[in-house]
Amino acid sequence: MIGWQINSAVTMGNRRYLLDTNVLIELIHGNRTVINHIIDVGISSCAISVISVHELYYGAYNTPSEKYFIQEMNRIKMLLSRFKIISLPEMPDDYGRIKTSLRLHGHIVDEFDMMIAGQALFYGLTVVTNNLKHFRDIENLKLEDW
């Protein structure tokens, strides 16, 4: 559950982060490790992909009960109100390059993950994910696992 206090004025270093959907789910459910990392780097250094927003809403709509659905929607809305949301830039070059390179090397990566990677490369962001294997074969992509 979201219940943390993060000081948006605190930023350590110049690195900026794009939080993958799985990290956002951990954050929504109160994972202290993720919360502490965000506190350490400063919330203003972190952003969310519009792709992850779509994935979060998809997850909420697949909940088993209306009560849980309402709780998840409230958590998502609270989360989204605290972070900058990154839209899809004019990045077909990054996406096309990533997909072609991976295909040529026999790697299959989720389409959404490729788009998130393309955003990160375009904006110079580090992807924070707990699914490093989804991204590790993408050339020049900076990754962290919180």
Please place each PLM-identified region on the residue numbering.
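Short, well-structured N-terminal submotif of metal-dependent ribonuclease cores
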Residues: 1-49, 58-75
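Active-site neighborhoods of divalent-metal-dependent phosphate/nucleic-acid chemistry enzymes
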Residues: 2-13, 82-128
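Generic structural signal for small/hydrophobic residues in well-ordered secondary structure
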Residues: 20-21, 56, 95, 120, ...
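Alpha-helix capping/helix-boundary segments
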Residues: 23-24, 52, 91, 116, ...
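Flexible glycine-rich beta->alpha loop in the catalytic core of nucleotide-sugar glycosyltransferases
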Residues: 29, 126, 133
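Short, hinge-like loop/turn segments at secondary-structure boundaries
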Residues: 64-67, 102-103, 145-146
